[in-house]
Amino acid sequence: MGMRFLKNEKGFTGLEAAIVLIAFVTVAAVFSYVLLGAGFFATQKGQETVHTGVKQATSSMELVGSIVAKGSTTNDNITEVTFTLQLAAGGQPIDLNKTVITVLVPKDGDFVELSYESNSSSLDKASEYYVNWIYSLQGSSPDNYLEEFEKAEVTVYLDSTGAGLDINPNDDFIIEVKPPIGATYPIELKAPPSIDSMMVLLK
């Protein structure tokens, strides 16, 4: 018996098959491009997050030289502490105007936060720390940034003429330097057994 084609029946031609195949390939290509783009974006964001995390976890500064303290032999306490800071290797410039120094005395549970001041004539010893620029890239007109090769000599005033802290012989105390970016730099100190007018403190 011969085959008969019913009226209105249509065959699936080679041209139609090619069009469908091209459509599938185009959609697959676009989908792959979107996925690859999302993958590259996620990778970039991941790298930025890791880089930011490393910067936040790493201290940008370090101590240079000795930590020197002045004391009152009358009141038997430390009156001020001076130390010098510089950038750590590979550290980013630090805006000292946004850097806070906290002094803690665990024995008494006392602490005070101090802000930056480089003008001795307007210094408020109770709420500010003083910075004397030993070396600045700007010469005699330093800005507020601690940059590579620069050295900033920091003085904090501790007794009743300053922050109002009473640090006596053998007392432990901590000076924390908190930059706007990077980890806090803690300096753990101990007052000597005997208070002198001038002392070198050990970490």
From Swiss-Prot:
* Swiss-Prot/TrEMBL GO biological process terms: archaeal or bacterial-type flagellum-dependent cell motility
Q: Where in the cell is it found?
A: Archaeal flagellum
In alphabetical order, the GO MF annotations are: structural molecule activity
Q: Which InterPro entries match?
A: Flagellin/pilin_N_arc, Flagellin_arc
For this protein, the record's Pfam families field holds: Arch_flagellin
Enumerate the propeptide ranges. Answer: 1-11
What is the recorded function of this protein according to its Swiss-Prot or TrEMBL entry?
Answer: Flagellin is the subunit protein which polymerizes to form the filaments of archaeal flagella.
Assigned protein family: Belongs to the archaeal flagellin family.
What is the name listed in the Swiss-Prot or TrEMBL entry for this protein?
A: Probable flagellin 1
This chain is encoded by the gene named: flaB1
